[in-house]
């Protein structure tokens, strides 16, 4: 058992001024029956807390650090940039050079704009889609998270489309009246809704691989159907690649699946560890944005030069030959061995590329309703057991874990041994 007295004291101090003691709910570790560790430093695959404990990190700031924490070249790029100024509210060349780098890897983003978070990116993309189509209805899928904008905090309570069912207090009914939620991986429900209402739909937004109910891959037929029905009815297909962008390949999930959306959002990796995200798409769609068009969007710190520099250096390294092949090879080796370890033990390993979730569930997990059948108490015990062994896995049954270039085979071997000891 690792001592975390300093972290416990820091948490009590934080709770006196920050609601719940944290700036994002999952960080409180409430669902896994413990209190948060407070981080002092991070390097490569490791994080170090204020009690001088060292942990192998499998959250990697929720997938941001695909190169590992505190990459030397990325840190230097950021420090060099900040020497010249951290924000100007005036254009810089750094914005254009990173935008060109993003478009190089995501050709579907013919025009793009930077914002500060994934929530801003999805919120802005939806506004653009509505402005372009002149329609109101947004279709999303149960269990897919697209940020905490009011009209996106909606989920269905059954395997049918529902309107106006907010999943957070403080969201007025009127904010969600144009959001429709369909069951994930259900082609029949998707086709039925579009057959009856498709001409009213402004956009369909989807995580091309669901990551925020745990990693739940789409069936090939389902993800292809999202492209088919939107094209048939003139609706905008938005791929929310805030997590999968630059994670599943240099061109994200859309390159991996060979499907071209009308609009895309990227985040996390694109800022190299700094607050940054982007939304973009076809040039004709993006032309409705002010100052060229009537759709307004703005941000004081959008495209700040420090994030742009860190993002550019990150993408530069990811674009080097063999990077994704190495990531895939290392991940496949780890995950194939993990599947053998958990076989017959009531655990499902869902994975795509370097992302995976261990569902403590007897049955395959294909949608949000399946995820809710998972044993959260068993997961919580597993999380605490892993923490005691010096491994920080993502602290929720309904989140993904992420492998980075810094997770060597030796480290992954130790993680496998620890998993075998930690599951019940």
Language-model regions, residue ranges each:
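Conserved N-terminal phosphate-binding loop of PLP-dependent enzymes in the Aspartate aminotransferase
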Residues: 1-424
């Amino acid at each position: 058992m690792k001592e975390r007295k300093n972290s416990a004291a820091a948490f009590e101090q934080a709770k006196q001024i920050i609601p719940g003691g944290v700036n994002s709910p999952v960080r409180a570790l409430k669902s896994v029956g413990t209190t948060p560790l407070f981080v002092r430093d991070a390097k490569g695959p490791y994080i170090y807390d204020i009690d001088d404990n060292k942990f192998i990190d499998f959250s990697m700031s929720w997938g941001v650090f695909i190169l590992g924490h505190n990459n030397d070249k990325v840190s230097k790029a950021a420090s060099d940039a900040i020497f010249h100024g951290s924000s100007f509210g005036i254009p810089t060349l750094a914005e254009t050079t990173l935008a060109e780098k993003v478009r190089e890897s995501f050709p579907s983003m013919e025009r793009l704009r930077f914002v500060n978070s994934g929530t801003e990116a999805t919120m802005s993309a939806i506004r653009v889609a509505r402005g372009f189509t002149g329609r109101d209805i947004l279709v999303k899928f149960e269990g897919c998270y697209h940020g905490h904008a009011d009209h996106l905090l909606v989920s269905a309570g059954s395997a049918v489309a529902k309107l106006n069912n907010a999943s957070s207090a403080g969201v007025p009914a009127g904010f969600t009246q144009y959001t429709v939620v369909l069951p994930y991986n259900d082609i029949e429900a998707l086709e039925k809704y579009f057959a009856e209402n498709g001409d009213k739909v402004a956009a369909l937004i989807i995580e091309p691989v669901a990551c925020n109910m745990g990693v739940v891959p789409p069936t090939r037929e389902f993800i292809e159907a999202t492209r088919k029905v939107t094209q048939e009815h003139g609706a905008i297909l938005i791929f929310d690649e805030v997590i999968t962008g630059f994670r599943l390949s240099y061109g994200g999930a859309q390159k991996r699946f060979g499907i071209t959306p009308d609009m895309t959002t990227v985040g996390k990796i694109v800022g190299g560890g700094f607050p940054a995200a982007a939304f973009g798409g076809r040039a004709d769609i993006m032309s409705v944005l002010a100052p060229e068009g009537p759709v307004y969007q703005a941000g004081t710190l959008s495209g700040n030069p420090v994030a742009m520099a860190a993002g550019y250096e990150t993408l530069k390294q990811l674009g080097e030959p063999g990077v994704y092949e190495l990531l895939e090879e290392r991940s496949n080796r780890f995950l194939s061995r993990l599947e053998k370890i958990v076989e017959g033990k009531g655990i499902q390993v869902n994975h795509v590329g370097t992302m995976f979730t261990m569902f403590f569930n007897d049955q395959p997990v294909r949608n949000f309703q399946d995820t809710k059948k998972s044993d959260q108490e068993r997961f919580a015990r597993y999380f605490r057991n892993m923490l005691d062994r010096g491994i920080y896995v993502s602290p929720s049954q309904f989140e993904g874990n992420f492998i980075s270039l810094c997770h060597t085979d030796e480290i992954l071997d130790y993680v496998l041994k620890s998993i075998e000891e930690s599951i019940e």
